[in-house]
Every structure is written in structure tokens, then in C-alpha cells.
A protein has these predicted regions:
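Catalytic cores of carbohydrate-active enzymes across secretory and cytosolic contexts
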Residues: 1-425
Length: 425
């Protein structure tokens, strides 16, 4: 049995009556459980070839689609640079952006591309200084996670790892640590206590780290308040790393990862949601993948066997950051402020402990982050990765998606419209 936190009432007649079913839309209705929705209907419709074929085909399509207008408006420097190199066909036919691939190894193009990224980072750094009062180094890695705050999206994994990095720098000030700026942007539903507590944790960690002169600015944490379209445009253009770290099997699909891709930010993420398709397009060597697979997560959920206390008891790094939740390190000595988060990870006080497998993926996430740093230190390698992400983003076009629906799902006839007719006459 698959468990959904929301009951969806679908009359039996609806599925047999329709030859196509949008599992991504349905997955959104049940908080992103696309894998489970697909599997349920695959069983329900077993032997009905029309249904089965539609489910398998539609699963490959993005539920939401990327429109290039936001990049044209928010990243004019990159848009102009692309047009200078391949012409303007990509503006009306996004798959044409693949022509950029021939420049991925070109040293001059790489330098130009990285300079554009730097200019965009300067712009975001200025915004952060004006709105947050925090000085950030535009030469640091801008590691970005901006999205709705939800436990399955695992902003908590991100900030726990930031706490771990801070511990490492404090213990080993001589270590060769490439400077990082972790940028969060999120909004939480009004009644979502755990999400709001996570935002509090992010800001509390930021207060401690950003005010510690002993780490010499190697690490900064920024929470962008009132995350919205206007500041999102600045963030997407400036991001070096796109954090897409939801628990595998939980994310239906979104457009944030696609927007980061189009702006030249390689994905650090799980094989979940549209990340799967991004990796298919750009190649796993141009992304940083970690964590449990969807099958592994679903197996734990269905059959049990996951014990987060194993990681707490055997991994001293995990144990230390979790203890810092309840020893006042990041809460001005208040040992109760973040106890709910601590308990939710290790006890059944609030339901299944570590429901979203944060501790299981912590070490794998840390290893992926080390690979990010290694790649970023090689500017030519990083520039190539970033450029190939831009050049491989053509699939995530609304025009392409609609045409595939027209041809493969709806089977509509093409109609030629005579644009010379005066429709107002």
C-alpha cells in the first residue's frame, strides 16, 4: 500500500473513460508523489495498452514548463551573449540553443561566459548588502536553494550541512576551503510550524556564522526575505550551484531547476522530479547527483528497516550537528528552541522519525558538495559544465512540450491560420 497525506477522490469511471492521464498533475495534488501515482495506475490499468502507454509516455514530460522570457528579462547579459554566438533563433525556438555546445571548449567563450556570471554575482551581492546588510564575496561559490519551504524539499539537509562545514572550518582553520555563500529563499505556509522553525534555524545559523571573524569570511549564509519574481531574477542569473535536493520520489516537477540550468548553474541534486530529465539532457558528468534512489526510499516506506539513530550513533559529524540543535550553539544558549527538529529526526514524537531520510543522505550529500568544490577550482572545467547546462536546456520549452502533447497525447490536427485576415472586421 502507498500512503498519501491527502485523500484524492477519483471516480473509477474517469480513468477507464480517458485514454490519457496526466500523472504529474495528479502527483502535484498529492504533494509530489509522482512515482506512487504512476505505480498505482499502472496496476489499476494493467493490460489496457492505451492507458499504460500514455502513462509511460507522459511521465517523461515536465509538469510545468520553462519559458525563456524570465531569463531575457533577468539575465540580459547572458541572453545577448548567446545571441552574439548563435543568432536569435533560440528566442523563438529554444531547442536551437544547443548550437552553443560547439563553444563549450572554446577558451575565449569560457572566459566571456564566466565574466558574465561574475557580473551577475556582483549585482546580487549588491542586493544582499542593501537588503540583508551582509557582505558576500562574489568570487565565492554561490550555492543556491530557492523554493517553497517544505520538509521533503530538505532545506534542513542543506543547513545542517552548512553547520557541519562551519564546524570543520572552526576546528581546522588552516584547511584549504574554497569560500562559499549559501543562499536560501523560501516562503512557508501560514500554519506550517516545522517549515517556519526551519527558516528560524537558517537565520540563526546565519547570524552566528556571518558574525564570526575567526573564519575569515570563508562561509556566509543568506536568507533572502520576501522571495518573489523580482529578486528571483537576480538569484537565478547569479547562481553557481542549483540545489535540488528533495527526497527521491517526492517531487512531481518544477521549473526552478530548469531556470537555473538555463542560467548556467549545474544541478546538485537527487534523481527526483525533473532532475532526472535534466541529467538525461546534460549528462551525469555535468551535474552532481547523490542520495537514495526513489526505489530505495519507497522500499523503506513500504517495508520498514530505516533507523536514523544508526547514523546518529555511528557518524560523529551527524551526531555533532544534531547535538548543536539542542545545546544552544546556534540559539543563544536556548536548548529548547530547535528541539522539535531534533526530535523529529530521531524519535517518533512527531510521527515517523526522519521521514524524509535526511540523515541517510547526509554523507552522500557532503561527498557531492566536495565534488562541487573540486570542479569549481578548475575554472575551465566549470565553465564548460555551466555552458553545457545552458546549451542542453532546449528540451524545457513550453513550445516543445505543447507540441508533444498535441502530437502524442491529444492527437490534434494542425491548423494553418491566415494572419492576413482582419479579425476585428
Amino acid at each position: 500500500m502507498h500512503y498519501f497525506p491527502l485523500h484524492v477522490d477519483i471516480e473509477e469511471s474517469q480513468a477507464p473513460g480517458g485514454l490519457r492521464l496526466n500523472v504529474h498533475a495528479l502527483g502535484k495534488a498529492v504533494y509530489g508523489h509522482v512515482i506512487q501515482v504512476r505505480d498505482i495506475f499502472a496496476e489499476y490499468l494493467k493490460g489496457v495498452s492505451g492507458h499504460q502507454e500514455a502513462l509511460s509516455g507522459l511521465y517523461g514530460f515536465p509538469y510545468l514548463v520553462l519559458i525563456w522570457f524570465q531569463m531575457l528579462h533577468g539575465n540580459q547579459l547572458l541572453a545577448d551573449w548567446i545571441t552574439d554566438h548563435i543568432g536569435d533563433e533560440w528566442i523563438t525556438d529554444l531547442p536551437a540553443i544547443s548550437k552553443l555546445k560547439v563553444f563549450a571548449d572554446d577558451e575565449k567563450a569560457q572566459t566571456e561566459f564566466m565574466n558574465i556570471k561574475y557580473q551577475n554575482k556582483l549585482r546580487l551581492a549588491k542586493y544582499i548588502k542593501e537588503h540583508n546588510g551582509i557582505d558576500v564575496d562574489p568570487r565565492s561559490i554561490f550555492d543556491v536553494q530557492v523554493k517553497r519551504l517544505h520538509e521533503y524539499k530538505r532545506q534542513l539537509l542543506n543547513i545542517l550541512h552548512v553547520m557541519h562545514l562551519y564546524n570543520e572550518i572552526k576546528e581546522h582553520p588552516e584547511m584549504d576551503f574554497y569560500p562559499r555563500t549559501f543562499i536560501f529563499g523560501a516562503k512557508a505556509a501560514a500554519g506550517y510550524r516545522r517549515a517556519k522553525l526551519t527558516i528560524k534555524l537558517i537565520n540563526s545559523v546565519a547570524d552566528v556564522i556571518n558574525s564570526d571573524p575567526t573564519i575569515n569570511g570563508k562561509l556566509k549564509v543568506v536568507f533572502i526575505e520576501d522571495y518573489r519574481v523580482s529578486n528571483a531574477e537576480l538569484i537565478f542569473a547569479a547562481a553557481d550551484v542549483s540545489e535540488q535536493i528533495s527526497t527521491a520520489s517526492k517531487e512531481a516537477s518544477g521549473t526552478g531547476n530548469m531556470k537555473f540550468m538555463l542560467n548556467g548553474a549545474p544541478t546538485l541534486g537527487t534523481m527526483d522530479g525533473a532532475n532526472v530529465e535534466i541529467v538525461e539532457e546534460v549528462g551525469e558528468e555535468n551535474a552532481f547527483i547523490f542520495g537514495l534512489s526513489s526505489d530505495e526510499v519507497i522500499n523503506f516506506e513500504n517495508n520498514g528497516g530505516y533507523d536514523p539513530n544508526y547514523y546518529f550513533n555511528t557518524d560523529q559529524d551527524i551526531r555533532r550537528v544534531l547535538m548543536q540543535l539542542v545545546n544552544g550553539t546556534f540559539s543563544n544558549g536556548d536548548m529548547e528552541l530547535f528541539r522539535e527538529i531534533y526530535d523529529s529526526l530521531l524519535t517518533n514524537k512527531y510521527g515517523t522519525p526522519d521521514q524524509y531520510f535526511i540523515l541517510a543522505d547526509f554523507k552522500s550529500y557532503h561527498e557531492a558538495q566536495k565534488k562541487v568544490e573540486e570542479a569549481y577550482r578548475d575554472e575551465a572545467r566549470w565553465a564548460k559544465m555551466a555552458m553545457l547546462n545552458v546549451a542542453s536546456s532546449g528540451k524545457f520549452s513550453s513550445d516543445r512540450t505543447i507540441m508533444e502533447y498535441v502530437n502524442e497525447i491529444w492527437h490534434l490536427d494542425h491548423v494553418t491560420v491566415d494572419m492576413s485576415i482582419d479579425l476585428q472586421a
